[in-house]
């Protein structure tokens, strides 16, 4: 019911990418065939099929982040806690992961609680809470806005507050 995406990946070094992802399913009494099907599907969606047999030391930071993300969302959790989930990703990989988050949210109503300093990443949310010095100082909702319009609102709030993005999101 709960998925975690850590900023520093937390993959097990002695397991392949495939095995790291499978860990989340292996405790759920799911058949090996179903586990394999789900891993292959998420691997394709996050563009990690070619690294499934690699160990973490053989992967780039972005690949590790995508494997860790796959492990967190493969169980279709009701809540995903994500700490800078796109921090180690290039723009293409970030978009793929954020689209997966959107898909989970829309299809099975998964809540994604994400910490980010990136306005682009935040623009995929339906609600953004700005925290400064440990206190909530603003909140905006996407509503019916397009992602571009919501992105512009995020930038406007940061600009109005007189800080840079690293201070506000």
Feature-to-residue mapping (PLM):
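ABC family nucleotide-binding domain
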Residues: 1-130
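Short, charged, intrinsically disordered terminal tails
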Residues: 164-165
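Conserved beta-strand-loop-alpha-helix hinge in the C-terminal portion
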Residues: 135-160
């Amino acid at each position: 019911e709960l998925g975690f995406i850590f900023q520093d990946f937390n993959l097990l070094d002695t397991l392949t990418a495939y095995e790291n992802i499978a860990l989340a399913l292996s405790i759920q009494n799911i058949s090996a065939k179903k586990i394999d099907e789900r891993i292959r599907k998420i691997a394709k969606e996050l563009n990690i099929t070619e690294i499934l047999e690699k160990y973490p030391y053989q992967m780039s930071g972005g690949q590790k982040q995508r494997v860790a993300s796959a492990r967190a969302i493969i169980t279709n959790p009701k809540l995903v806690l994500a700490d800078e989930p796109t921090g180690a990703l290039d723009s293409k990989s970030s978009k793929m992961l954020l689209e997966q988050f959107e898909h989970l949210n829309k299809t099975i109503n998964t809540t994604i609680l994400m910490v980010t300093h990136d306005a682009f990443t935040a623009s995929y949310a339906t609600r953004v809470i700005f925290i400064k010095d440990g206190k909530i100082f603003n909140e905006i909702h996407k509503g019916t806005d397009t992602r571009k319009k919501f992105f512009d609102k995020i930038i406007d709030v940061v600009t109005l507050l007189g800080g840079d993005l690293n201070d506000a999101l």
